[in-house]
Design a protein with these regions (language model features):
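Bacterial Sec-dependent N-terminal signal peptides
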Residues: 1-23
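N-terminal, active-site-proximal structural segment of metallo-dependent hydrolase catalytic domains
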Residues: 18-94, 176, 269-271
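Loop/turn elements at helix/coil->beta-strand transitions in domains of secreted/extracellular proteins
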Residues: 24-29, 67-71, 98-102, 150-154, ...
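Active-site metal-binding loops of divalent metal-dependent hydrolases
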Residues: 33-35, 77, 158-160, 193-195, ...
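Surface-exposed cleft-lining segments at the edges of enzyme active sites
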Residues: 44-49, 127-133, 159-170
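Alpha-helical elements of Rossmann-like donor-binding domains used by nucleotide-donor carbohydrate transfer enzymes
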Residues: 58-62, 143, 174-178, 202, ...
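Structured beta-strand-rich core segments of catalytic domains in phosphoester-bond hydrolases
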Residues: 71, 75-160, 251-254
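Metal-dependent phosphoester-hydrolase catalytic domains
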Residues: 129, 167, 181-189, 195-271
Length: 271
């Protein structure tokens, strides 16, 4: 009898173990932020100087350390946190405030537009820069192909057109459809952006209709991310995915570091 009970218990444990293997999930933390060129969005170039560098280095480093994101997508990034002067050298932003991220994929800078992806512990296979086919300003999307737990994941950092009264919404719709078409055959996609949807979060619905999930305009409703400070009014920053479930979504508001709030979420890769 005891032998029978032992064998039944062993079989049950083996069954639980097999089920656990069949239902293996991978969870990562992803953050998306318009960092405003270290100029609070008021310029297409950094406004920080050597005299304040130590303070901002400590502040940004503490901010990113507490954030603890596996993947951090930044738009309106500035490769330099401080520009060179006649007597002092320029200061590289990755080295100064983001050196805790081993992998840095930084796209070209066009005035206000510069997209970047920082990551740790996830294999980076390649990175491509793709210009949008239709745009008012010079706009592109940065695509980093990663391998996460054996699966290929496309991670995108982008910044769509603004110009609300100058073909902004129609051009954004074209850009959104271009992204949907580009990744239609990919199982796992993570898109981080300042989508510039202004007061029209319904612009995100094209992604929903294409089978995507999202952190903003998702299960928590419309989260206001711009401008940072006491009275954000627009739902424009978002993490949009295919093949991932969203949880623990947070908006982090720090008007001293950017004119945009940061949005972060835990993403669980679905089988």
């Amino acid at each position: 009898m005891k032998k029978t009970i032992f064998l039944l218990t062993l079989c049950a444990l083996m069954s639980l173990s097999l089920n656990a293997q069949d239902k293996h999930f991978t969870k990562i933390t992803v953050a998306s932020w318009n960092i405003g060129h270290f100029a609070l969005g008021k310029s297409g170039d950094t406004k920080l100087t050597h005299s304040v560098l130590d303070f901002y280095k400590q502040t940004y480093r503490a901010y990113f350390n507490e954030l603890n994101a596996d993947i951090l997508a930044l738009v309106e990034y500035n490769p330099l946190i401080v520009n060179a002067t006649e007597t002092q050298a320029a200061v590289d932003a990755h080295e100064a405030i983001l050196s805790n991220y081993r992998d840095a994929q930084i796209g070209p800078k066009y005035d206000y537009n510069c997209n970047a992806i920082f990551s740790n512990g996830i294999e980076v296979l390649r990175t491509d820069t793709v210009m949008f086919s239709k745009m008012v300003q010079t706009r592109y999307y940065l695509v980093t192909t990663m391998r996460l737990d054996g699966d290929i994941v496309k991670v995108v950092s982008t910044h769509l057109d603004w110009n609300q009264g100058e073909n902004g919404a129609p051009y954004r719709a074209i850009q959104i459809q271009e992204l949907i078409d580009t990744f239609k055959n990919d199982k796992y996609v993570i898109m981080c952006a300042d989508w510039n949807t202004s007061n029209s979060p319904s612009e995100f619905d094209a992604f929903i209709e294409a089978g995507y999930d999202m952190s903003n305009h998702g299960y928590l409703g419309n989260l206001l991310t711009y401008p940072a400070g006491s009275s954000p009014r627009s739902c424009i920053d978002n993490i949009i995915t295919k093949g991932f479930a969203h949880s623990n979504v947070k908006v982090i508001n720090n008007a001293m570091l950017s004119d945009h709030c940061l949005i972060k979420a835990d993403l669980t890769k679905l089988p």
